[in-house]
Amino acid sequence: VLREDAAVRDAAYSIVEHCDWMPALLIGAKHINEVPRSRCAAGHKAMWHAKWGGLPSEEFVCSLDPVLAGFRDRLYSETTTAEKPVGKLCPEWAERLGLSTDVVVAGSEFDCHMGAIGAGAKNNTFVRVIGTSTCDIMTVSPEELGDKLVRGICGQVDGSVMPGMIGLEAGQSAFGDI
C-alpha cells in the first residue's frame, strides 16, 4: 500500500499489527503510543530485539525500502509477552460484551504461537501447527541456545511463544484455502 498509494502513505502515521490492535481496542487505547506491542509480532515480523534497543535503526529500515522513511520513530521500543496483563476491559467493551471492567486483558501473540502452547509446547518440543498457514514452532532455553543464530528459519525471538524461552519459528507454508 505504501508503494502504490501516495495519499495513504502521506496520511499514514504508524503501523499496527492486528494482534496488537485487539488488546488495544479492548482496553480503550486512544493513541498509538498507548497500544501494547506484542513481543511475538515485533520480534518475528519487525526484527525487534532487546540487544539493539528494540527495532532496527532508521538507516537500516530505509536501506530496505526508502518508502519506510519516518516510520521508525513513530513505532515503539518496548514490547510485552503474552502472559502479562496489558490493562483491563474498558467501559465501552465491558458494556458491549456484558462483562465487568475488572476483566484483565492479556498481551498477545500470533495464532501459530498460541497454537503451539495449546498443543503442549515446552522446552525442546517441536510443534507443527496446521491451519490456513502451517508453522513449525520450537522453544529452547536461552542458556541452551546461547548466542547461536539458527539458519534457515524465519524467526528466533525471546518470549515469543513462552516467557523465558526462545521461540523458533519456521514454515509459513501456504495451506488451507489456496
Regions found by a protein language model. Give the residues of each.
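Catalytic phosphate/nucleotide-handling subdomain of diverse soluble enzymes
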Residues: 95, 103, 108-178
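Gly/Ser/Thr-rich active-site cleft segment
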Residues: 1-109
